[in-house]
From Swiss-Prot:
Belongs to the AdoMet synthase family. It comes from Wolinella succinogenes (strain ATCC 29543 / DSM 1740 / CCUG 13145 / JCM 31913 / LMG 7466 / NCTC 11488 / FDC 602W) (Vibrio succinogenes). Pathway: Amino-acid biosynthesis; S-adenosyl-L-methionine biosynthesis; S-adenosyl-L-methionine from L-methionine: step 1/1. Pfam families: S-AdoMet_synt_C, S-AdoMet_synt_M, S-AdoMet_synt_N. This is S-adenosylmethionine synthase. Binds 2 divalent ions per subunit. Binds 1 potassium ion per subunit. The keyword Cytoplasm applies. The lineage of its organism: Bacteria, Pseudomonadati, Campylobacterota, Epsilonproteobacteria, Campylobacterales.
Length: 386
């Protein structure tokens, strides 16, 4: 590893078009799974200038008023006026959802009570000691800024902000550890009558300096706030939005590999989602146990097959025991079949809309069961660690 380097991650606000799509897809999933926990859901959303298309496949016994759900999500985000680029009242919403293919379903719902993986695929989980939530610092800080943008807009602190926005944080590392922030980029949609100077000062003073840890705020940070100038046209009026296009924002900000599968709109029989949650659960518990300082987990599945086809543990040279021993431990202490993951993490709950903005990982909310470190003591005992 290089002695000194810079690493960058980004986040987007809940009003970013891609995140709007994720939230609509997950709100529909929540509505269905609350009423039919055995439902199979694959819900995709497209947003563009003045309209929204909902597509995908379902197998369920319940009815979901998808247009009403979508309008409520758009309203909650803050698109309540056409001047903002989208209006929940007037947007055209098309429902094109169909029935799940029986060819897929036959491999998932098995007669023996097990659940086969809903598709093939590989998922990654990651944890490190850079933050209290065992997340990489650049993505952690980026999310703090975008959350701050939304809060300042909604509580009236900065009433000239609009829903669409992004952040990006570059962190300086020495000997593999973060030592400070090098660059912060914030782009935020705003009212047409606010000056760029006022906007820049307000974002830095009212958001960045208030939400980021003081130990990382030096006088030499480079700030770029709306570096191209005005950002009045935003939301789906400025860019189309699509479910599953912010998978790096959703995960670890590029600090570890990604298997390529998106999360939102998918019920937990889809291992793209549940497998990634399980991989984070494993990685976080390994680091929390003290057996390593950093862990990358890969899990892979075959469609219709119960057991994972492979499990990999990589502690990047920080482990107190060999990685192959950790793999054996993981296989013994964690249930990594689709059914085992669903049951151990209690995933048949309407918890998913909360995951669809500001990251699926590193947020220790009661609903986010994959953030628990309840296996840490078992791992310590397994290796007789003090």
């Amino acid at each position: 590893m290089r002695k000194e380097f810079l690493f960058t991650s980004e986040s987007v606000t809940e009003g970013h078009p891609d995140k709007m799509a994720d939230q609509i897809s997950d709100a529909i999933l929540d509505y269905i799974i609350e009423r039919d926990p055995k439902a199979r859901v694959a819900c995709e959303t497209l947003l563009s200038n003045g309209f929204c298309v909902i597509a995908g496949e379902l197998k369920t016994t319940t009815y979901a008023p998808m247009q009403e759900i979508a309008r409520e999500v758009i309203r909650e985000i803050g698109y309540t006026d056409a001047l903002y680029g989208f209006d929940y009242r007037s947007a055209g919403i098309l429902n094109g959802v169909g029935e799940q293919s029986p060819d897929i379903n036959q491999g998932v719902d098995r007669e023996d009570g097990e659940i086969g993986a809903g598709d093939q695929g590989l998922m990654f989980g990651y944890a490190c000691r850079e933050t209290e939530t065992l997340m990489p610092l650049p993505i952690f800080l980026s999310h703090k800024i975008t959350e701050g943008l939304a809060k300042a807009r909604k509580d009236g602190t900065l009433p000239f902000l609009r829903p669409d926005g992004k952040s990006q944080v570059t962190v300086r590392y020495v000997d593999g550890k973060p030592v400070g922030i090098d660059t912060i980029v914030v782009s935020t949609q705003h009212a047409p009558d606010v000056s760029q100077e006022r906007l820049r000062d307000a974002v830095i003073e009212e958001i960045v300096y208030k939400v980021l840890p003081k130990e990382y705020l030096g006088d030499d940070i480079r700030f770029f706030v709306n570096p191209t100038g005005k950002f009045v046209i935003g939301g789906p009026q400025g860019d189309a939005g699509l479910t599953g296009r912010k998978i790096i924002v959703d995960s670890y900000g590029g600090s570890c590999p990604h298997g390529g599968g998106a999360f939102s709109g998918k019920d937990p029989s889809k291992v793209d989602r549940s497998g990634a949650y399980a991989a984070r659960y494993v990685a976080k518990n390994l680091v929390a146990s003290g057996v390593c300082d950093k862990a990358t987990i890969q899990i892979a599945y075959a469609i219709g097959v119960v057991e994972p086809v492979s499990i990999l543990v990589d502690t990047h040279g920080t482990g107190k025991v060999e990685d192959d021993q950790l793999e054996t431990c993981v296989r013994q202490l964690f249930r990594l079949t689709p059914k085992g993951i669903i049951e151990s993490l209690d995933l048949l709950r309407p918890i998913y809309k909360k995951t669809a903005s500001y990251g699926h990982f590193g947020r220790e909310l009661p609903e986010f069961s994959w953030e628990k470190t309840d296996k840490a003591e078992l791992i310590k005992n397994y290796f007789n660690l003090k």
